A protein has these predicted regions:
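Iron-associated oxidoreductase/ferritin-like identity signal
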Residues: 1-155
Length: 155
């Protein structure tokens, strides 16, 4: 994969992630959860703009052509399973992180390399936020062990 393709793939991945988080933000009735996904969507939009800037800087006379389908491919994903959806989102963050690290490794310009490493680090932070959501969901689903209630409830 050449650098143009890597930038294009990274931008397409950011747009797909934005679309995923936008859909997730709309699908929850809980305001806190909606805000969480809306914020992630904004982070991904910021990444898209930064990567577009890097592309324009490196290839100033070449128009960026997005070729991938920009809707999130979620065949086989159980949308009714919040944990599965969050794990899918984590996999998308991991993909973006790998692309940024590969681009940084290939970059000769120090400022470009630094920005790409920063983007990779931010993707790691996004993963941590998503893992925290999984823990929160699991905590809500398993907030007590029924056996601990034996003796406290009348039969």
């Amino acid at each position: 994969m050449n650098r143009k393709d890597a930038y294009r793939i990274a931008i397409e991945a950011e747009i797909r992630s934005q679309n995923l988080y936008k859909a997730l933000a709309k699908s929850f009735k809980n305001e806190e959860t909606t805000q969480f996904y809306s914020q992630l969507m904004l982070y991904e939009k910021d990444h898209e703009m930064k990567v577009r800037g890097l592309y324009a800087q490196e290839f100033p006379h070449e128009k960026l052509k997005l070729v991938g389908k920009l809707d999130m491919q979620m065949e086989g994903l159980e949308l009714g399973d919040p944990k599965a959806v969050l794990e899918f989102a984590i996999s998308r963050e991991e993909l973006a992180q790998k692309i940024y690290l590969k681009l940084a490794e290939q970059s000769e310009d120090a400022s470009t390399k630094a920005l790409l490493k920063q983007l990779a680090a931010e993707e790691e932070q996004h993963k941590e936020l998503l893992y925290a959501e999984i823990e929160k969901i699991q905590g809500l689903l398993k907030w007590f062990d029924r056996s601990e209630l034996d003796g406290f409830m009348e039969h």
